Structure formats: C-alpha cells, structure tokens
Amino acid sequence: MAQTVTARRSRGDERRLRILAAAAELIADRGYHAVSMTDIGVSAGVVGPAIYRHFNSKADLLAALFEQVIDTLLVRASAIVEQSHDDNLALTQLVADHVSLVIEQRELAIVYYREVHNLAESQRSRLRRKQRLYLDEWVHVLGELRPELDETELRATVHGAIGAVQSILQYRDTGMAPDRVPTLLARMGHSVLGVQRFCPEGIASTQRDPDTDMPKR
C-alpha cells in the first residue's frame, strides 16, 4: 500500500512539473493572456480537467512559476554565500548562477521577467519579500568588496547587475554563438558591480571581448 501511494505521488509530482514546463514555454512565447489552461494541458499531455487537480486556476499556475524561480534562486544564493570562503568567489558564483537561469531556463526566466504585473497583489507581495531576501545575499557580499558604497548604493548596483544579465531576455536571437553568451552576460554583470571575476589563480579576467556590440532586436 505504501509503495502504491508513493508511486502515485511520484507520478503526480512528475505531471505537475510537466504542466509548469509547458506553461512556461507557452506563456514565454505568447504572453499570459493569450494562453489558456486547455492549451497548457494539451501541451503537457494532461487530459481535460485533470490539470485542475494540480492548479486551481491559471493565476495559481503563474504564481507557481514565480515561486519556482525565486525559491531556486534563493536556496542557491544562500548556499553560495554560506559555503564560500572568499567574497569575490561568492559574488562570481552569484552572477554565474543568475546567468545560468536566463540561459538554461530561458522560458521560465522570460515569464519571471515579463509577467509579474499579472500576479495578484498578495502574490506580488510574497514575491517581493523573497526577492528582498535574494538581493540581501548579493548586497551582503558586495558590501564586503565595495565598502565605499552605502546600503542604497549597494542595492541599486545589485539591481543594475541583475538587470544587465536579464537584458538578454529581450532578444529572440542574439546573433552570437551560444557559447559566447554566458561569458558576455557575466562580464556585463561584473562591470555593473565594479568587481572583477574570481579566478583560481587569484587574478580576475580582464581580457576584452571583441564581440560586445548589442544584438539586433
């Protein structure tokens, strides 16, 4: 009996993840209001009203996508800061982790970047609280490396760096080789932060990237 319940729960979790992935892909491509729960269910291979066993509404599904992003970012950021022995290394890893989100989970990141205005106010408030905690991790580390900045300046700088990394989400095609994009985004983030990237040898990379022209929209 216990094994049956566990297997059923596992199938339910897997189906829920399929629904979230399908929703992220469709909403990123069409926009929130142009996608229906039926569209999402069909894309996820969930028949009829079965999708409502996992999400009461499209609004709840959208909120779950935002929770998925911010919870993952927050857990990873906390682990990076807690486990790192070097502030420069920690900041480099924070930048790299955010770059990884926008590159490897592009559809999910696009929804996070574009659709916050479609969340209910209570959901936006909860999201903002978690976002502040995420920013706090960056601000704490950057404050150790940039002691000349006050709290307001540190937060503005972190916002700018994250915005620079997420700017790639405005473009469907960057015109660059895929393997060059993460390096460019990391360089942009560190440029805004005013802190060079950590290297194991103790010398941060300052080599200029010749392909720094902004991509065409």
Regions found by a protein language model. Name each.
Residues 58, 69, 73, 98, ...:
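Hydrophobic/aromatic residues within well-ordered alpha-helical segments
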Residues 7, 18, 22-60, 64:
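Helix-turn-helix
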Residues 92, 96, 151-162:
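Short, well-structured alpha-helical segments
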Residues 64, 78-104:
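Hydrophobic alpha-helical connector segments
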Residues 100-136, 170:
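Short secondary-structure transition hinges
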Residues 15-23, 40, 65-69, 73-77, ...:
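Generic hydrophobic, amphipathic alpha-helix propensity
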Residues 121-146, 155-159, 183:
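Amphipathic alpha-helical packing segments from all-alpha helical-bundle domains
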Residues 1-3, 100, 136, 140-144, ...:
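C-terminal peripheral helix-coil segments that are non-catalytic and often amphipathic
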